[in-house]
Amino acid sequence: MEYYRKLIGERIFLAPVRIEDADKFCRWFADAELAMNLTMFDRQMTKEREEAILSDMVKNNSQIFSIVINNEEQLIGSCSLFDLDHSDRKAELGIMIGDKSCWNQGYGTEAIELLLDYGFNILNLNNIYLKVFEYNERAYKCYNKVGFKEIGRHREARIIMGRKYDEIFMDFLASEFTGSKLSDYFK
């Protein structure tokens, strides 16, 4: 089944998430290396539960997208803006590149840039924030590269095998965002 192209980048596009992809997401969540970077690391995920989560996110007006490689229709992950607060114009960003063969290739960076552009210029958000665990160095570097700033820490928030790690809070303000690709549509 073909994905609908909502936000198109150079190498990827973001498409509305499809409930039928829940099985693939569950297989990715079962991978401990990937799952330990997510907030749901300690939970079992079934296809039915993932379908329910995706349905709830769509119903609750979360902006959740599949990340798909251009010209291949290959699903490699998902990203979202959730907990949207239209009064204070803020939302939380989440991203997962589930296909490990696509790690360290810039797909996550491109997806985040598309999502920021959409959040600031279409949804009219002022603040997009996220959380990342300090051991997830790849993600932390990506967020810094895109322009997120560290704004605080929840110290020793995650304990794995007796070792304690901070949860890092980062955000990005609309006034700091300069990389709009969507502006080409509105000249």
Residue ranges and their predicted role:
Residues 129-132, 149-166:
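Conserved catalytic-core motifs of GNAT/GCN5-like acyltransferases
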Residues 108, 112, 135-139, 156-161:
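Short glycine/proline-centered loop/turn elements that form peptide/ligand docking sites
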Residues 104-118, 140-145:
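Conserved acetyl-CoA-binding loop-helix of GNAT-fold acetyltransferases
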Residues 1-51, 176-187:
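A short, well-structured alpha-helix characteristic of acyl/acetyltransferase catalytic modules
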Residues 99-101, 105, 134-135:
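Active-site acidic-Proline motif in GNAT/NAT acetyltransferases
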Residues 121-131:
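Conserved GNAT acetyl-CoA-binding A-motif
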Residues 43-102, 173-176, 185-187:
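Acetyl-CoA-dependent GNAT
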Residues 143, 148, 170:
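Conserved active-site tyrosine of GNAT-family acetyltransferases
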